[in-house]
Amino acid sequence: LRCLNCPEVFCRNFHTCRNGEKICFKRFDQRKLLGKRYTRGCAVTCPVAKPREIVECCSTDGCNR
């Protein structure tokens, strides 16, 4: 599995996930509309969202755009 791994809105950096990591995720703070920064990467399970945070998970190459 290959997931995007950079904080910019238009990310092109791919990271090859380790064995056992079968989820790509993207998380961001829903309050910050301008200058939005993302945390993207691989995970074993979908991360739990903190208050006012949005977490999106998927399981195909490059799906965490």
From Swiss-Prot:
Secreted in keyword set: yes
SUPFAM superfamilies reported in the protein's UniProt record: Snake toxin-like (SSF57302)
Tissues expressing this chain: Expressed by the venom gland.
Matches recorded under InterPro entries: Snake_3FTx, Snake_toxin-like_sf, Snake_toxin_con_site, Toxin_cobra-type
One GO MF term attached to the UniProt entry: toxin activity
Gene3D superfamilies: CD59
GO cellular component term, pick one: extracellular region
This protein's record includes keyword ATP-binding: no
Family stated for the protein in its record: Belongs to the three-finger toxin family. Ancestral subfamily. Orphan group II sub-subfamily.
UniProt protein name: Weak toxin CM-10
Biological source species: Naja nivea
Lineage: Eukaryota, Metazoa, Chordata, Craniata, Vertebrata
